[in-house]
Curated annotation (Swiss-Prot):
Belongs to the LutC/YkgG family. This is Lactate utilization protein C. Pfam families: LUD_dom. Gene3D superfamilies: NagB/RpiA/CoA transferase-like (3.40.50.10420). It comes from the Bacteria. Is involved in L-lactate degradation and allows cells to grow with lactate as the sole carbon source. Disulfide bonds: none annotated. One of its GO terms (biological process) is lactate metabolic process.
Amino acid sequence: MIQRRETFLNNVAEKLGRGRRTAGVKRPDYTVKPQFEVMKEHSSDQLVNVLSEQCTKIHTDVKQTKVDRLEQAIDNVLEEYSARNVITWNDPRFDQFGLTSFLQREQVEVWDHTEGERLVEKAEQADIGITFADYTLAESGTVVLLSGNGKGRSVSLLPTYYIAIIPKSTLVPRMSQVTRELHLKAASGERLPSCINFISGPSNSADIEMNLVVGVHGPIRACYIVVEDR
């Protein structure tokens, strides 16, 4: 597409029956922006309630806990899912939220981008993958994951089950807030991740026969653990 951009755009203009417009096109300055009004007055507790209600519709479990009980909350989910082998991101938030000892367990593998192929295989074999959410959309029950060296996509994609740890401060009403923040970061010259994933619960597919099938393109079960920030 990038290589043939001019040809493509010329063809579109021709089909429209006019010449190419290469100047004088301005982005509309909208005076009304309703996308930012939805739930803008909601407190973090209200957003948690919205998230929890939405997650009942997307087959996603939601747990709430405090930092000092986070490791126990994870253990409870592992037991509930009968999951043993774990793979996690290499993310400083695991230490910040008191999970240093959890990462040192024998059955826990921590992502290392220098061992990509081996870790992809480990992710395929893992019972459960655990990451932190960078943003969380209450309206749609979506966690947003920003890729990075220690934050391999395989961790949330390949294991049988998935846990997203959601710091309460990451909750926003909807996608509007996240896209605006990412746009502002890009406009200020900040380099954005090469991959930004929006994950709404376990893998659901019903696009062929209109019958819901879970786990075709990812984990068959997902749990969001909402945790109070330090």
